[in-house]
């Protein structure tokens, strides 16, 4: 076995370990973004490894080498996602696309620097354009994530105020439609069982504050049974391990809810809430009847 082929096999083994062995990645926006972004450099290296391993093979000169490496790189990415599906792993078409971007980037970078194949200047310019496009695709979600964190941290102790669409990066829907209209988040409850919107991953340390202030309105002609729940990173996903409270809103009523943080701290039954690591705030409809609309103006700490 040639040394190049051995290196390629080791690279495939390493790629398999990175894809299928659970990694200690935090369940945060940053963690998810960086985990997804990692597919592109991984399959860039896999495809580049195929190119360097097979470049001296007489059956794959010129364009054939690029076709082989591209098919192996992109195909390996697709197969890796197919394999993850029955293993209850987080397989997605987004990951397949990221794998393909890595493979195409490897082909473009290789074309820029290899001199065995006779290429015209415009071929190399095309390869440069493709490489830059792939790098832009790779960097876009990372830049978007960075902007979201800078915005979130700069607004604190305001947790959400909906003056910018960046706020939507920190909201999750559970059986609702949501959209920013003016300076408020308009929420339409669609599902019947506890639909709501979560404000995920706020600035976590609330220890220097006394009150959670939520400015909301019920714009509908029916009353709304509004539920508020808050939990920390230790939350075990049970009702008794978080703060829960209901607030009835009359038809057309706008109200500022003021929740003492001491109440939130004492929310879990068997322990105290970790006020240095708050993870999630959720506003939801408590019952199946009543208003199907909620307007959220802001959430802040005082």
Give short role names for the model-derived ranges.
Residues 216-220:
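Asparagine-centered strand-capping/turn motif at beta-strand->loop junctions
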Residues 87-90, 221, 271-272:
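Short, solvent-exposed loop/turn segments at secondary-structure boundaries
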Residues 214, 256-299:
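Extracellular beta-strand ligand-recognition surfaces/modules
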Residues 1-94, 100, 104-204, 209-215, ...:
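Bulky hydrophobic segments
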């Amino acid at each position: 076995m040639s040394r190049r082929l051995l290196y390629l096999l080791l690279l495939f083994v390493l790629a398999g370990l990175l894809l299928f062995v659970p990694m200690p990645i935090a369940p945060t926006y940053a963690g998810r973004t960086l985990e997804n972004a990692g597919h592109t450099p991984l399959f860039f290296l896999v495809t580049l490894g195929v190119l360097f391993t097979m470049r001296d093979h007489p059956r794959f000169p010129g364009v054939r080498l690029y076709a082989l490496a591209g098919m192996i790189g992109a195909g390996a990415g697709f197969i890796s996602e197919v394999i993850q599906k029955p293993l209850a792993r987080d397989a997605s078409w987004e990951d397949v696309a990221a794998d393909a971007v890595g493979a195409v980037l490897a082909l473009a970078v290789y074309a820029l620097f290899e001199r065995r194949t006779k290429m015209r200047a415009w071929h190399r310019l095309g390869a440069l354009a493709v490489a830059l496009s792939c790098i832009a695709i790779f960097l876009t979600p990372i830049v978007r994530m960075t902007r979201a964190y800078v915005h979130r941290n700069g607004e604190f102790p305001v947790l959400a105020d909906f003056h910018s669409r960046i706020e939507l990066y920190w909201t999750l829907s559970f059986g609702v439609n949501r959209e920013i209209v003016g300076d408020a988040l308009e929420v339409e409850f669609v599902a019947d069982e506890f639909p709501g919107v979560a404000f995920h991953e706020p600035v976590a340390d609330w220890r220097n504050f006394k009150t959670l202030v939520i400015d909301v309105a019920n714009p509908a002609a029916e009353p709304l049974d509004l539920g508020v729940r808050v939990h920390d990173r230790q939350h075990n996903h049970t009702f008794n391990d978080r703060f829960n409270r209901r607030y009835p809103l009359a038809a057309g009523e706008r109200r500022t809810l003021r929740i003492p943080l001491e109440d939130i701290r004492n929310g879990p039954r068997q322990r105290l809430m970790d006020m240095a690591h708050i993870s999630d705030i959720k506003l939801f409809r408590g019952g199946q009847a009543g208003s199907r609309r909620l307007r959220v103006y802001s959430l802040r700490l005082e």
